[in-house]
Amino acid sequence: MIDLDNIIERLYEKQLIAESVIAYLCSLAKEVLMQESNVVRLSTPITVVGDIHGQFDDLLEIFRIGGPCPYTNYLFLGDYVDRGYYSIETITLLICLKLRYPKRITLLRGNHESRGITQTYGFYSECLRKYGNANVWKYFTDIFDFLTLSATIDDTIFCVHGGLSPSIQHIDQILVLDRFREFPHEGPMADLVWSDPDPSVQEFSLSPRGAGFSFGEVIVTKFLEYNNMKHILRAHQLCSEGYQILFEKKLSTVWSAPNYCYRCANLASILQIDTDQSRFFNVFDAAPNQETPFVEPAAKVTAEYFL
């Protein structure tokens, strides 16, 4: 057995967890995550978090502002790793919280929860640097295949990492997708994590990202009407003010990585939704006094450490 409370406490202190423990945590997490639907039904009150991208100090700031888990019910919209210095600590803490409080934290999959993307944008190299091998990267990227794709809040707000797909008119179509695999380059599963709203278009158009689609207000309105929903909530795009509201308040983007990549000088936000479905974007700046990363010797963190 592993003492999750002890591991969570150590993670809050930014300690690196042993490779053998991470392997065990990931095996436990698969059992929990595989029970979740492709569309997880959630209820208010709830706090929604956008991209984190390995900015661990800012994740701790989110828990300080929004309240600690499990006292606050959290929905994370994906993109936990890459670009920031502490992707390992970030995803390890979130997985531990999911294991400890499975009904109080929901983790969606973002486009960076992918083997291909993480080999390019930092997570893979961070694992090599901190552990001396790619085993931890493999454990976590295997877990990414189990993360759910979307959620609804009070059956009126549709939540996803990226956006909509021309292959999906009804939310029930998401339920039948085979999510337990690496993202394909195209198709509905890719669209959900890659697509973006675009006020300059009305329907679907090819995305400049090279994956997913851009979509306009007509598409958003049709999707909401067809599914008897009121709002779409997503992440995936940097917002200089921490959030953006589009299409006559039918769609919101929440971005939760302040001073993105430690140089963009943007604000961030979390979205707090109350039982009356009122929405409050709690805007915050980067956590103060962020440290330069210190990497422990690989031999030290790969030792057995079962508690």
Swiss-Prot record:
Mn(2+) 1 binds at residues 51, 53, 79. Its cofactor is Mn(2+). GO terms for biological process: asymmetric protein localization to old mitotic spindle pole body; negative regulation of septation initiation signaling. Binds 2 manganese ions per subunit. The active site is at 112 (proton donor). It is an enzyme of class 3 (hydrolase). Mn(2+) 2 binds at residues 79, 111, 161, 236. Pfam families: Metallophos (PF00149). CDD domains: MPP_PP2A_PP4_PP6. SMART domains: PP2Ac. It catalyses: O-phospho-L-seryl-[protein] + H2O = L-seryl-[protein] + phosphate; O-phospho-L-threonyl-[protein] + H2O = L-threonyl-[protein] + phosphate. SUPFAM superfamilies: Metallo-dependent phosphatases. The keyword ATP-binding does not apply. GO terms for molecular function: metal ion binding; phosphoprotein phosphatase activity; protein serine/threonine phosphatase activity. Its EC number is 3.1.3.16. Keywords: Hydrolase, Manganese, Metal-binding, Protein phosphatase. Gene3D superfamilies: 3.60.21.10. One of its GO terms (cellular component) is mitotic spindle pole body. PROSITE patterns: SER_THR_PHOSPHATASE. Belongs to the PPP phosphatase family. PP-X subfamily. This is Putative serine/threonine-protein phosphatase C22H10.04. It comes from Schizosaccharomyces pombe (strain 972 / ATCC 24843).
